[in-house]
Amino acid sequence: MYYSEEIGLPKTDISRWRLRSDALGRETWHYLSQSECESEPQSTFVQWLLESPDFPSPPSSDIHTPDEAARKGADFLKLLQLDNGIFPCQYKGPMFMTIGYVTANYYSKTEIPEPYRVEMIRYIVNTAHPVDGGWGLHSVDKSTCFGTTMNYVCLRLLGMEKDHPVLVKARKTLHRLGGAIKNPHWGKAWLSILNLYEWEGVNPAPPELWRLPYWLPIHPAKWWVHTRAIYLPLGYTSANRVQCELDPLLKEIRNEIYVPSQLPYESIKFGNQRNNVCGVDLYYPHTKILDFANSILSKWEAVRPKWLLNWVNKKVYDLIVKEYQNTEYLCIAPVSFAFNMVVTCHYEGSESENFKKLQNRMNDVLFHGPQGMTVMGTNGVQVWDAAFMVQYFFMTGLVDDPKYHDMIRKSYLFLVRSQFTENCVDGSFRDRRKGAWPFSTKEQGYTVSDCTAEAMKAIIMVRNHASFADIRDEIKDENLFDAVEVLLQIQNVGEWEYGSFSTYEGIKAPLLLEKLNPAEVFNNIMVEYPYVECTDSSVLGLTYFAKYYPDYKPELIQKTISSAIQYILDSQDNIDGSWYGCWGICYTYASMFALEALHTVGLDYESSSAVKKGCDFLISKQLPDGGWSESMKGCETHSYVNGENSLVVQSAWALIGLILGNYPDEEPIKRGIQFLMKRQLPTGEWKYEDIEGVFNHSCAIEYPSYRFLFPIKALGLYKNKYGDKVLV
């Protein structure tokens, strides 16, 4: 029973929810009338996710061998695939996303439909800290000022009364943390838009930077794509002092989120609070150069001429509209989407065509689940999960069973439809994307290096298998050549991190720019960074491509692979042999990818000291029950931190690395496989255990499909290498 049920909060009827998804993977939730329900049955995925008694659970059976376990897992996963080939999931974890959705609606006076409102309240309540009732940066974090303030305000704006026990408890925690004045930069900005804080107390985000010459290293177009996408509209709202009209509810909230000794609101000297951030929140403190710049810019804001601001506004809004054109009004992610929606409402009005198109996209990032409804980290994980499923069914031999062909065909065709076939509009500061794949959907519009490589590899696998000859030409060789060109473009071959691959683009500015990081709660956000995982996946894709297309730029591709491998080797920890992961937790995740990349170029435990050290590192972390467990704390501290209990996903990661690294002793690998099999339910399902992903070193995020994909891969690889033995 969830906490929301214990305290008697309203909930919707789970039988009336439907998830609709189109050919390009768009996901939207709908609450139907009883008559509509009869003509549109729930998918088995929705029945499973919402814990419906109507879910057709597979029959229970004893599982004795790795192949039986892999097949049982694949059979269960089949029930979670939609007809368009995707594996939808609630990509959740961050607790600062929903405030944008709620703020954009409140600012534009857009009413949130009742079923969504009810379930958003449930989710926030069900993710409150069980002891102090606050919220953190993410769902498994300690309570922070940022998380507690944002979610407190959300609950109030969604209709919860201030005297509700949930809010009384949360308010006590918020006051203990110093009240709303101690929010980090983004928190202060959202509060200012809501007229719950004053812009004079927010450090500047100068939109004038977009009018600077591009050749300057500080030009925002050279920043990391997420950071520039957020600070583009944030700069507009800050410079134009965009705020809601003050109403009775906002007046009430003003008197709730500050410590009583700080009130009345009108007496707070907001200009003195710009750098006042709660110590619990402060992951990346200001540098002296940033404080100096903020001091100068805050004085500039007071004297900036109106004509200059109008000139800058025009440039900023032009770039925002280009973002709409490049992403079909989705924007790169929910934070920038919400800021952009506020800007469009302010600049054009709520009756404008652009605003109405944004309203049509608002629910793309909402996802329902048993805890309630929340705003996800992006509009999904569609391409990423589909590419892995296809690959792993090939690598494990499941492809040889015709009963899995339909699954593979659906995901293959989805990947084909998801490739970018045109570039971005001119003047939007975007690199070539034609030929690339995104993380989620084609409409989202952003190239990602590892997604491109993994999708390309999956497609090549299907195109070269006799069972799928009839759909081979759904994508042409030239499309794959385009994908390779994008990967070659993204690799860092200049003066910064030679041989590495970043996420969306190559590194365009010196890493020293991080000293101007204003966010306070994240690290490594100012510019693109090199990532071992992205480099690993790019190697996997390019080596597989070279195998089937040996005549396409062989020398350049081999040079690219060789320099990437050297970067992977150079990134290994000299002491313990691990690799640090930035997108999964943490050393286990990155070590798996690194060992697989090294495996593809023929390096193993016997031939490579790096592989030997990497495998020995993983072995040293195995727990007595045969599993592995790494805490998200290691992402923050940059040192391996054991988790409390062995975890299925991390155990699968370690096993994959050991098997592909050709670790010579089968015994610890066998114990790990036995652990995976014992954790599997008789129906084939693995239950959720703990958060799997991370970003920017400090924020955890869930990848729900991982608990199926990686155990299936580990089990199949074991069977391929050691035979299908009775282990349980």
Swiss-Prot record:
Family matches, as Pfam families: SQHop_cyclase_C (PF13243), SQHop_cyclase_N (PF13249)
InterPro entries in UniProt: SQ_cyclase_C, SQ_cyclase_N, Squalene_cyclase, Terpene_synthase_CS, Terpenoid_cyclase/PrenylTrfase
Pathway given in the UniProt record: Terpene metabolism; lanosterol biosynthesis; lanosterol from farnesyl diphosphate: step 3/3
Catalytic activity, as annotated: (S)-2,3-epoxysqualene = lanosterol
Active site: 450 (proton donor)
GO biological process per UniProt: ergosterol biosynthetic process; triterpenoid biosynthetic process
Organism: Candida albicans (strain SC5314 / ATCC MYA-2876)
UniProt name for this protein: Lanosterol synthase
